[in-house]
Regions:
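Mid-domain beta-loop-alpha active-site segment that forms a flexible
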Residues: 105-125
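Glycine-centered flexibility sites
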Residues: 40-43, 114-115, 127
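A short, aliphatic-rich alpha-helical micro-motif
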Residues: 2-3
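E1/E1-like adenylate-forming module used to activate ubiquitin-like modifiers
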Residues: 6-108, 142
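Phosphate-binding loop/pocket of nucleotide- and phosphate-handling active sites
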Residues: 123-143
Length: 143
């Protein structure tokens, strides 16, 4: 089904290893994989190059993977002196909650993330440069 495609979008929930399996199959078929995330007030996208580092390098366990991605973003942004204090507060609050609630998402970040995906897909299709994991796209309405 994914034969002869240049890119795929992996927006699967990390409730099992299926997203990792999907990435592996795409890598074997030389397909870029876009991983979009809705962080409420921000959109995040990373593109996994078929020959590059897998997203699974953040954690090989699917449970809580979205949180690992958010923590990675926080660490990366802090390293480059662009801390996202609001996201840090959201992550800490989420970690304190009990139960298996999904991460908080807002429609505004869905639109932001869709734009990031559209631009990345355009760049892949036209042979332009695209940030590849471990680099990423991050666009926030909050500072």
């Amino acid at each position: 089904m994914i034969e002869e495609h240049d890119a795929a979008i992996n927006a699967l929930d990390f409730k099992s290893d299926i997203p990792f399996v999907f990435d592996k199959i795409c890598s074997e078929k030389n397909i870029y994989v876009l991983h979009p995330y809705n962080f409420g007030w921000a959109g995040f996208l990373t593109v996994v190059d078929p020959d590059g580092k897998p997203l699974e390098s953040l954690s090989d366990k699917p449970l809580g993977f979205e949180l690992k991605v958010a923590e990675y973003v926080l660490g990366y942004q802090a390293f480059w002196m662009q801390p996202q204090e609001w996201l840090d507060k959201v992550v800490k609050q989420y970690q304190r909650e009990e139960g298996a609630n999904p991460p908080p998402q807002l429609s505004v970040a869905s639109w932001i993330t869709a734009g990031l995906c559209t631009q990345a897909l355009f760049n892949i299709a036209t042979g332009k440069e695209v940030k590849r994991f471990p680099k990423f796209y991050f666009s926030s309405l909050l500072q």
